[in-house]
Amino acid sequence: MAVKIRLRRMGQKKAPFYRIVVADSRSPRDGRCIEEIGTYDPTKDPSEYHVNEELAKKWLSNGAQPTETVARIFKSAGIEK
């Protein structure tokens, strides 16, 4: 099973916020996830995010691949493999 760390869209139309989730790469964007590890709100200025660093590091060490956007969020949060 290929595991990805990616964003799950939440919120209303034209007012999105995202949850950072660990999910199977074959599941749909807003489908079933394995675990939620944070949130990201791009509508605020500046963008706001909260990440559980312990869970993020655990999943990265287990081989989960972050998407480009999540990798950028992790980099600004100081989370690396």
UniProtKB/Swiss-Prot annotation:
Pfam families: Ribosomal_S16
Signal sequence bounds: none
A GO term from the CC aspect: cytoplasm
InterPro entries hit by this protein: Ribosomal_bS16, Ribosomal_bS16_dom_sf
Transmembrane segments: none
Keywords carried by this UniProt record: Ribonucleoprotein, Ribosomal protein
GO biological process: translation
Recorded GO MF terms: structural constituent of ribosome
PANTHER family: 30S RIBOSOMAL PROTEIN S16, SMALL RIBOSOMAL SUBUNIT PROTEIN BS16M
Family statement: Belongs to the bacterial ribosomal protein bS16 family.
Name of protein: Small ribosomal subunit protein bS16
Phylogenetic lineage: Bacteria, Bacillati, Bacillota, Clostridia, Lachnospirales
